[in-house]
Design a protein with these regions (language model features):
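A fold-wide structural signal in alpha/beta-hydrolase
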Residues: 61, 85-95
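An N-terminal hydrophobic leader/cap segment in hydrolases
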Residues: 1-53
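Conserved alpha/beta-hydrolase "nucleophile elbow" surrounding the catalytic nucleophile
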Residues: 66, 136-138
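Catalytic nucleophile-loop/oxyanion-hole region of alpha/beta-hydrolase
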Residues: 83, 97-133
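Well-ordered alpha-helical segments embedded in enzymatic catalytic cores
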Residues: 50, 76-79, 117-121
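The serine-hydrolase catalytic nucleophile loop
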Residues: 70-82
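Short beta-strand element of the alpha/beta-hydrolase
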Residues: 59-67
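Serine-hydrolase catalytic-loop signature spanning alpha/beta hydrolases and amidase-signature enzymes
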Residues: 67-72, 91
Length: 139
């Protein structure tokens, strides 16, 4: 696994604390991407997961998982998708159970310890890709 290099990030002076860094893009950031291909993925227990594909024919895939009470259409998800596309990845952004537009079929909602849905997504998306990167936001 490659090692990450130190980051020289310095926030703008007007975003002088972490709270503002979180709130500002939520209110003012707009990310424009072409329309996605939306699919429904059946789970092992008969529920359904919603996925948004951003396909450009790249050999690599980034699977992006949203944060607590987020979804695949949030600006931070779209921003990450845009960045991954620019780095040569196709993108699959998925919604945890109960976080998309579809109602759950089962009485099971998501929780951070339930990795079986992520495994379902990886198995669904993997064919045809030479490399898969998992990207996740804080729960």
């Amino acid at each position: 696994m490659p090692l990450l290099q130190p980051c020289n990030f310095q926030r703008p002076k007007y975003l002088f604390n972490g709270h503002l860094e979180t709130i500002f893009p939520t209110l003012f950031r707009q990310v424009i991407l072409p329309p996605t291909q939306q699919d429904l993925v059946e789970t092992h227990d008969g529920d359904v997961l919603e996925v948004d594909w951003h396909r450009r024919g790249h050999p690599k895939l980034a699977i992006i998982s949203h944060g607590l009470e987020g979804n695949s259409s949030r600006s931070y998800m779209l921003g990450m998708a845009k960045e991954a596309l620019s780095k040569g990845f196709d993108v699959l952004a998925w919604n945890y159970r109960g976080c998309g537009e579809q109602l759950n079929r089962k009485a099971i909602f998501y929780h951070s310890g339930a990795t079986y849905d992520l495994e379902t997504i990886v198995r669904y998306a993997a064919p045809g890709y030479t490399e898969i990167a998992l990207v996740g936001f804080s729960l």
